[in-house]
Amino acid sequence: MKKIAVMSDLEMGGGNLTDDFISDLALSETIDGLKEERGGCELIFNGDTFDTIRMPVLRNGIATHPILLDAESACRKLDLVKKAHGPVFRAIREFCLRKGNSLTFVVGNHDPELIMPEVQKHLVRLLGIPINKVIFAGYCYRKYGIYLEHGHQHDVYFKVETEKAVSRFRQTEIAHTPIF
């Protein structure tokens, strides 16, 4: 039987002052342990895997916090996350390359751009894994009789209307978050 492991609220940032994730070694070792499960393992990151919402983006050498959550900025932020948390990315890659293992992401309020296909493709490239090893479940996970969603969907201030999660603004696709 396939094992299911769920992790939430890691909030890995870009290694700057807003990044308070300091558990690279512990998380890497945990993921390394999961890759050996008999029958395979599905690792589910149930929201806030990354903390893109608090990360600045460098534009012309200046750190800015864009109000609009566009895919280009999110991809730049994920590049910084990988640089800051390389051991975790390595562990996820090795986990996914094992037969029977798979990875699932649920969108959280700290990483709302994960709903965007361009950001998803970029993350898969950064992880160095085959696309068929990862599922982007959107705002909820329903499988094996299990239902998961990130807690922000029950918070009046952070709940996202899933049918309005992405829109266009001046030719740019943006992810919605209720705080803007």
Spans of model-derived segments:
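Extended recognition/assembly regions associated with phosphoester-bond processing machinery
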Residues: M1-F180
